[in-house]
Regions:
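Charged, low-complexity intrinsically disordered regions
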Residues: 1-151
């Protein structure tokens, strides 16, 4: 981890990271810019990504896309997965779904107490960092509203 930017509370961190995917001959080194948001409350663990070919065939490997009722367009455009599908469906309110539908695609992962957000598997430029920061601040607000609605 390098090129770190964070707020004084250390709850909102932007950073560049190098990591490896795969093994042996298929090993690939990845460099990317990520945003980590520490939450003040607990939310369901989930992964949200753009629906693509790999996500569509992952059903054969046992992975299941969680559908959000009355939001078929969202379910076609995004791949949502997590262990507690009922809690995730309850958490993804109409406003949260609309938030994701009306913004550029970002990969978003929640472990329950924090959220990790990134866009592309490469180091972001200044304009992309500003966009990621802006998206993250607005996402943080939306997630807070969702926790108040279900809590």
């Amino acid at each position: 981890i390098y090129n770190r930017l964070f707020n004084t509370e250390n709850t909102f961190k932007l950073f560049d990271i190098n990591y490896s995917e795969g093994e042996f001959i298929a090993k690939e080194d990845v460099r990317t810019t990520m945003l980590h948001i520490k939450l003040n409350s607990v939310i369901p663990g989930f992964t949200l990504d753009q629906e693509g070919f790999l996500e569509k065939v992952s059903v054969f490997a046992g992975f299941k896309d969680i559908a959000i009722e009355d939001h078929s367009d969202f379910s076609k455009r995004f791949y949502l997965r997590g262990e507690d599908s009922v809690a995730i469906q309850r958490f993804f309110t109409d406003n949260l779904v609309l938030f994701f539908e009306s913004n550029p695609y970002y990969h978003v992962e929640s472990n329950g107490t924090s959220v990790l957000v990134y866009s592309k598997e490469r180091i972001a430029g200044i304009k992309e960092i500003k966009s990621l920061h802006n998206f993250g601040k607005r996402l943080q607000t939306e997630l807070l509203i969702c926790t108040q609605n279900i809590g």
